């Protein structure tokens, strides 16, 4: 447990899994400095917002939170106020003009330098750190939110230039960690009792493009496929997942490896964004709907029970009703287990934000509503296949609504509830599924020999 010689801290995280992983590392740094986790942001001595700028509503929420803490700091000058993440990177110095009470503004490439930057704050400086920074040698020990499941960053940044996306400008160019370093981190996690690892990257299929080495066959020596083989035999790790994938780089070789390696879970998150080829071209996504359908076909051919989740955008500039209907058709055809949906939000410094044919907000709202209704219907249909089956569930915690139940996830990432009985958090339990909902399952624990996959 961290000591409290410097007081308490509170971190609020907005956005993606990458941000959550960064927040865990920053929490680890703060505890190594002598801070301890507080009970709430309004009581903490240091408040840090790890921000997201992927959509405008997330960004505006940050400013609302900041306004409250700025008022608090005017009454309590000893409060340390930090903005990290993508809004910090995007806005930089202008954040200080908007919120002069801030002590530190730091982009995501500087998350592992939090201790160094705070030492400058303690010396009386108001600090902005948004310059490009090579981060791979700066990996720090994280304070994990879970004691069983951990994120492991394998590649930072993104070299894609999707016309709607601000990520490359705020997270920088791709930087891949060495396979040996990733394996070493996983071995340390296994020694600490972790059972499930999710390998993380903004565009994880691009892993290794910046690393040297060519095989005799002429392909890159370090790919995500090679990495999965390299880390698969880490003792103690029972499950391996990875996210987020890009259809342009999602290869048949990768799919075959996932089918062959028993620890790799049968769950794939592969965003498609639109079901219309003209819009995909305008988005600069680099693939067609036919290519996306082939990926799904290959996954289901080798892993018939695999779960497939994705992301989709409605209301992209120029989207016609006919083009939106093609997105609905794709969703209806594939039947995603989960689909993260969003109305297009113009982001600063992206080409699509300046295009003249912006879709009206009320049209976006109606399209999003229609898509979400279809998503729920298809998810309910997907859930039916689990009824009566026995699924392997890693018990991650106690059901907050019923403390007699444990909850965890199947290998296909379905949230599942079951009576605890003699089982405890951390057990891997065969559960017979007796009730299905759109996005969760319920059942009862079975004797170990009943486990089938």
UniProtKB/Swiss-Prot annotation:
It holds the Pfam family UPF0004. It catalyses: N(6)-dimethylallyladenosine(37) in tRNA + (sulfur carrier)-SH + AH2 + 2 S-adenosyl-L-methionine = 2-methylsulfanyl-N(6)-dimethylallyladenosine(37) in tRNA + (sulfur carrier)-H + 5'-deoxyadenosine + L-methionine + A + S-adenosyl-L-homocysteine + 2 H(+). Coiled coil: none annotated. Its EC number is 2.8.4.3. One of its GO terms (biological process) is tRNA methylthiolation. InterPro entries: Elp3/MiaA/NifB-like_rSAM, Methylthiotransferase, Methylthiotransferase_CS, Methylthiotransferase_N, Methylthiotransferase_N_sf, MiaB_methiolase, rSAM, rSAM_horseshoe. [4Fe-4S] cluster 2 binds at residues 158, 162, 165. Keywords: 4Fe-4S, Cytoplasm, Iron, Iron-sulfur, Metal-binding, S-adenosyl-L-methionine, Transferase, tRNA processing. Residues 7-123 form the MTTase N-terminal domain. Residues 384-447 form the TRAM domain. Its main location: cytoplasm. Residues 144-381 form the Radical SAM core domain. It comes from the Bacteria. Binds 2 [4Fe-4S] clusters. One cluster is coordinated with 3 cysteines and an exchangeable S-adenosyl-L-methionine. It is found in: Cytoplasm. One of its GO terms (molecular function) is methylthiotransferase activity. Disulfide bonds: none annotated. [4Fe-4S] cluster 1 binds at residues 16, 52, 86. CDD domains: Radical_SAM. GO terms for cellular component: cytoplasm. Its cofactor is [4Fe-4S] cluster. Monomer. Catalyzes the methylthiolation of N6-(dimethylallyl)adenosine (i(6)A), leading to the formation of 2-methylthio-N6-(dimethylallyl)adenosine (ms(2)i(6)A) at position 37 in tRNAs that read codons beginning with uridine. Belongs to the methylthiotransferase family. MiaB subfamily. This is tRNA-2-methylthio-N(6)-dimethylallyladenosine synthase. It comes from Synechococcus sp. (strain RCC307). The lineage of its organism: Bacteria, Bacillati, Cyanobacteriota, Cyanophyceae, Synechococcales.
